[in-house]
């Protein structure tokens, strides 16, 4: 029984089958397969932006220092597919049950930071990146002496890596294979038509969107009792 998750080469070859193109042994074999990798990277970003996927969930921890408000989330020690953070879902600290509340306004955080309040951290903000590209978070209030040495835990969704033709042929794509194949078929049809939304493309795109929405709905204990609405998607979960 084969895995529902496919390698880059398996995805491209299945698309070749559907497009009546000869299968390849490497994605650098012809211009169609090379371009398919570029389109695949577009689909990876689109899927990551559509919602929270279980396959992309990861976490990291930092040690808090008394009086320090900014911390780098070091993800470079993780595997390649998890080096880059797409979005942060939750920040919590040991010794506190509820998660920290996000601060959306950077001006507000800068004002709070000037207060130099020290105590139990209760709020956080994403504050740019450090010199090596790791994202930084700022917490308020600054950790007090009783929190020095405690851990702050960051739950985040990783950003899928950019695939390179030939080099990444054996890499397993982190999204369900059927969804990715249908999305790449639609993208290839649109590209072949020069951007014209033909009936063939519209039919392929409808299949892809239905598969994508259904797969994303299953990520959140789909029971059929509730309707989940987000931009571009209305699905029962």
For every predicted segment, state its role:
Residues 1-237:
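Glycine-enriched, solvent-exposed interface loops adjoining structured elements
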